[in-house]
Every structure is written in C-alpha cells, then in structure tokens.
Amino acid sequence: MSEIEQFYPRLVVEGADAALAFYAKVFGGEVTERYANDGRVQHAMVVAGPARFAVKDAGDGDPAPSGGGIPVIMALYVADPDAVAQRMLDGGARVLFPVTDHEYGERAGRLADPWGHQWMVAKRLP
C-alpha cells in the first residue's frame, strides 16, 4: 500500500499574486490558501474542480523557469479545451500546440502561461 497521502505540483513564478489571479480566472478555480512573508508569496493553493496545485514566488533555492521552458507539463482534462485555451490566451498565455483532434482519441493543445509553465488542455473524444 502506498504511503502517499497527497500529491500536487508547486509552480514557482515571478509575481505569484498575478499568477494566482490568472490561474483562478482561466481555470474557473479559487485560491484557497495564501501565505506571504515580506510581500512574497511563500505558499498558495489553487483549487479548480478536482485539481489542485500550489504557487509561490521565486526566491533563494526556488528559481522561476527561464524562457526556455521546463521539463514538466501540467495536463488538465476539461469539458471544453478550446474555451480554456482561449481564456489562457486572453490572460497572456501563448500557444505551443493549438487545440486540435488527435488520432489517439483526444482533443488537446498546449499553452505556456505568462510565467513559462506549460499546460496541456484536453478532453477525451467519444
């Protein structure tokens, strides 16, 4: 039996408050926790449906991703990936791969948020 009780990604960004507002808006979620010290967010939790992830400001030992990207892609399965992608674009994200139907039975695309984190938005096709 696994000893894991919980798992979620923690995104490191420059400008956590702006990132939190972006994520809550584009994913239809809410910020359920926010702890700051000296004006820098140390930990904040975004909850959107069954998904949850943390956000924090970059700092000593926790650098934000560079413009070259990061080796992690967050995968979100949603009812309408086109609508989520559009909200992300409206908030300043950029398209890496447009939302389209794929031969493996998904409608999916990938975007980079304004802080460099990559998000795949998808739904399984019938």
Put a short name on every predicted segment:
Residues 13-15:
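Conserved beta-strand-loop-alpha-helix junction that forms the acyl-donor binding cleft
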